[in-house]
């Protein structure tokens, strides 16, 4: 099935809480994950909550990477949404799993913007759809 985007939603469990509460570490890890996925970084925003926790997003030309952390539980919710067929979202997630020391990861994958459901002829598409199996 052809789609415009590929989204992976991941739950990271048993992470190193000190990394999840460090806004600079989280920012650097997310930017490196975007680079490892071959994304073109446009901008980023991250916020450290008091007393702990970080939320942030890296906006990339191909869509986004987002994270919300709960260091007190060793947990992070990660979202990688990419468009096109040269981006490697799995590479981003594998890097983040290692960076945060996740002991367990649960993922759910979705195809976003299913071309067949749009009723738009392939030759009229402005974005090259990812070929998601």
Curated annotation (Swiss-Prot):
Catalytic residues of the enzyme: 63, 68, 83
Keyword Lyase in record: yes
Site (described: Cleavage (non-hydrolytic)): 62-63
Pathway in which this enzyme or protein is active: Amine and polyamine biosynthesis; S-adenosylmethioninamine biosynthesis; S-adenosylmethioninamine from S-adenosyl-L-methionine: step 1/1
Protein name as annotated: S-adenosylmethionine decarboxylase proenzyme
Pfam families xrefs: AdoMet_dc
Enzyme class: lyase
Cofactor binding, note field: Binds 1 pyruvoyl group covalently per subunit.
Catalysed conversion reaction: S-adenosyl-L-methionine + H(+) = S-adenosyl 3-(methylsulfanyl)propylamine + CO2
Alphabetized HAMAP family for the sequence: AdoMetDC_1 (MF_00464)
Function: Catalyzes the decarboxylation of S-adenosylmethionine to S-adenosylmethioninamine (dcAdoMet), the propylamine donor required for the synthesis of the polyamines spermine and spermidine from the diamine putrescine.
Gene: speH
Family to which this protein belongs: Belongs to the prokaryotic AdoMetDC family. Type 1 subfamily.
N-terminal signal peptide: none
Cofactor: pyruvate
Species per Swiss-Prot/TrEMBL record: Acidithiobacillus ferrooxidans (strain ATCC 23270 / DSM 14882 / CIP 104768 / NCIMB 8455) (Ferrobacillus ferrooxidans (strain ATCC 23270))
InterPro entries per record: AdoMetDC_C, AdoMetDC_fam_prok, AdoMetDC_N, S-AdoMet_deCO2ase_core, S-AdoMet_deCOase_pro-enz
GO cellular component terms listed in the entry, alphabetical order: cytosol
Residues recorded as bearing Pyruvic acid (Ser) in the entry: 63
Subunit structure: Heterotetramer of two alpha and two beta chains arranged as a dimer of alpha/beta heterodimers.
Gene3D superfamilies tied to this protein: 3.30.160.750, S-adenosylmethionine decarboxylase domain (3.30.360.110)
EC number: 4.1.1.50
Highest taxon listed in the record's lineage: Bacteria
Keywords: Autocatalytic cleavage, Decarboxylase, Lyase, Polyamine biosynthesis, Pyruvate, S-adenosyl-L-methionine, Schiff base, Spermidine biosynthesis, Zymogen
GO molecular function: adenosylmethionine decarboxylase activity
Keyword Glycoprotein found: no
């Amino acid at each position: 099935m052809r789609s415009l985007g590929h989204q992976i939603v991941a739950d990271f469990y048993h992470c190193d809480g000190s990394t999840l509460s460090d806004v600079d570490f989280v920012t650097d890890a997310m930017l490196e994950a975007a680079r490892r996925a071959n994304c073109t970084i446009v901008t980023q925003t991250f916020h450290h909550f008091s007393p702990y926790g970080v939320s942030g997003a890296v906006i990339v030309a191909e869509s986004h990477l987002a994270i919300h952390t709960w260091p007190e539980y060793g947990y992070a919710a990660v979202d990688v949404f990419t468009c096109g067929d040269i981006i490697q979202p799995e590479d981003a997630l594998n890097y983040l799993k290692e960076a945060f020391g996740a002991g367990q990861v649960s993922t759910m994958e979705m195809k976003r913007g299913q071309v067949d459901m749009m009723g738009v002829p392939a030759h009229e598409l402005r974005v090259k759809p990812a070929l998601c199996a």
